[in-house]
Amino acid sequence: MISFTLRTEDLSIEEIRKFYVDTQHDRENIEFLKSNVTGLLIGSRGTGKTMLLKVAEKELLEKFELNRTLPVFVSFSSAALVDNEEEKFKKWMLSKILFALQGQLKELGLLKTKNIFSLLLGKESEETDELAIKINQLIDKLEKSWKKGVIDEEPVTPFVEDIDYFKELLHSICTELSIKSIIFLFDEACHNFLPKQQREFFTLFRDLRDPKICCKAAVYPGITSYGTFEAFHDSIVKRVEKDILAEDYVEKMRDIIERQIDSRTYNILVQKGELLDSLIYAATGNPRVLLKSVYEASEKLTSLKKANVNSTLKDFYRTQMWNEYTKLGEKFDAYKEIVDWGRRFIEEKVLVETQNKNARSENEEDYDKQTIYFIIHKDAPELVKKAISILEYSGIVVLHTEGYKIRGNIYNRYQINMGIVATSTSESDLSAYINKLRKGLSIKVITEYGANSVAFKELEQIKNNINLDDGGIDLQTLLSKPIDILDIYEYQKTEIKKEGFCKLIDILKASEMDLQRAYLIGPVRARNIYNLAMNAVLEYIIG
């Protein structure tokens, strides 16, 4: 069965080379990632941050012999399971970074010894072997600390306990191997972290700054806790969203589709070009949203019919996207009221005003122009800005222009997801409406919300109920969730429950052999179920 690959993590380096579609904006971001400046890549879910990091890594590796700039891709996928105690978490992060560096050096054939420590001594020794083993054991212990077991407090090495020692180690490696600089690329740098861990990561991110060391991190808007790290002062910030008004927007988004399927299947889609383009514009520049909606609308890439496209648009943008957004209030309990307010603000205020502007009669000004834009004053209440950034995280709105000046005041201009705009109308032919909408689109037609807009009044009334500093997930509560959230067959859930594995923590505490006690659960399925339970925890945290 033909299908799309939705996540870069599932692609090999060869597939990344094949699937990546270069745009001017993406190229600028890749060059930024390859540069020797500290920076953040910000974008909502599915906008291609990991793809850009991987392409940047690949291009740096291809030119390594010439430029001697070493990229190191670092993933912190198990972070949420690590003990939250500050020093332990810092040791874990430094250990993971060190092993990622060691792996990259081995991959390039630069590390002729068993480990980094042997490299510095110039010879193999029991001492360096023991040190590498102890660091590996530390990582394993900390990643199992969610079990509330006792963590051995025995010192390991200053290299993962003191940031200055760590940096000196990296300096020595650079000198020994004639490396000009190391660029650490942190994928989902804090998507996998609990809020407290995010703040600790960004402290480390800032402390690693050095002429030989450069850090880049991919982050989400809205749910990132920076602590004392000031994103716009301590780093360069770049956005990843694609411009739907770019001349080559449709061409590039079609190219993303074409590269993942065979020519016969692609021809099925492009023969209905207007329908395909309506899905492309509805996605508002988000590749993952595009691929998911095209797959659904085309009945698993077998046909493209107007009725199916309209049905998919309605379900995807009126139901699925809003449901995913609303779940954030359940996940981040402290944010619930602000999440709920954000939905009401968009549905009851912004979309109503947007439809009023788009339905103007011929005797009204700008009657032939359409909009998906609104602006918010830079001095609007902080809770309003937070609410909008959470909407950004979900892809419901996108920051279009920062520092937009009108009548002497400074605003941020946002665009609403075009699929959301279309499905908020009473139109039955949504694909035709989207094509009409995009043809008349004008960034000058906007709805304005001033610093003290009456639209913000309700949020001011509930602000005392919101504690942004505490907006996290309690890991033990999450581990107590029933196994029903796992993506496995119902009969497997039933059999597993019979053996007493009713919650995620029951599975994670068990061995694969324990799971095999359940009827019809063999070794392969047992491992699959264990991995699903682990992934369910991580996926729930990162969204």
Question: Where are the predicted features?
Answer:
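AAA+ ATPase "lid" subdomain C-terminal helix
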Residues: E296-K305
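Compact, charge-rich alpha-helical regulatory domains located at protein termini
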Residues: I466-G543
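P-loop NTPase nucleotide-binding core
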Residues: V37-K180, P221
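Short acidic, S/G/P-rich loop/turn micro-motifs used as interaction or catalytic elements
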Residues: A80-V82, A189-L194, P381, V398-L399
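The catalytic "switch" region of P-loop NTPases
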Residues: F159-A282, S428-Y449, I466-I473
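The conserved phosphate-sensing helix
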Residues: A283-V294
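A short, basic N-terminal segment
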Residues: M1-G39, S44, E59-L66
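C-terminal leucine-rich, beta-strand-based interaction scaffolds used for sensing/assembly
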Residues: S3-T8, V289, N308-T477
